[in-house]
Amino acid sequence: MPLNREDKQAVVAEVSAQVAKAQTVVLAEYRGIAVGDLTKLRAQAREQKVYLRVLKNTLARRAVEGTPFAPLAEQMTGPLIYGISEDAIAAAKVVNDFSKSNDKLVIKAGSFDGKVMDKAGVQALASIPSREELLSKLLFVMQAPVSGFARALAALAEKKQAEAA
């Protein structure tokens, strides 16, 4: 069913609001994907707080107009699904991970930090660990010397007690 003018304006406004908050936009061609698989992709995107939408390309072009993602308009051809996220790598990670298990989802392009990326760029962005993973690694590295020092003190205390006994 075609959208009337008010519906189109509402869609553009909704997508524009998401794009205004976004750090990353990923475009992927979804031709031939079963509805069940697309539903799984949407569920994964929701878990990662990625806005995922199948959208007419003309409406998407209007939504990115005047934003850092405007250069992506040249890539907006064919049946595309748009992944938009506030997290720098979440959209790329969700789409890339799903495309590994479903060869009918083909990453077409993406944009991060005002730069348009090709498929290889999106895959490289997806390979970066998430913020939480990086913070946990940093915390582990910071804790290692402290816990080692604590174990050394405990061993020294045990040794002194053994000598005293």
UniProtKB/Swiss-Prot annotation:
Forms part of the ribosomal stalk, playing a central role in the interaction of the ribosome with GTP-bound translation factors. Coiled coil: none annotated. The lineage of its organism: Bacteria, Pseudomonadati, Pseudomonadota, Betaproteobacteria, Burkholderiales. It comes from Burkholderia cenocepacia (strain ATCC BAA-245 / DSM 16553 / LMG 16656 / NCTC 13227 / J2315 / CF5610) (Burkholderia cepacia (strain J2315)). NCBIfam families: PRK00099.1-1 (NF000955). Belongs to the universal ribosomal protein uL10 family. GO terms for biological process: translation. GO terms for molecular function: large ribosomal subunit rRNA binding. One of its GO terms (cellular component) is ribosome. InterPro entries: Ribosomal_uL10, Ribosomal_uL10-like_sf, Ribosomal_uL10_bac, Ribosomal_uL10_bac_type. Part of the ribosomal stalk of the 50S ribosomal subunit. The N-terminus interacts with L11 and the large rRNA to form the base of the stalk. The C-terminus forms an elongated spine to which L12 dimers bind in a sequential fashion forming a multimeric L10(L12)X complex. This is Large ribosomal subunit protein uL10. Keywords: Ribonucleoprotein, Ribosomal protein, RNA-binding, rRNA-binding. Pfam families: Ribosomal_L10 (PF00466).
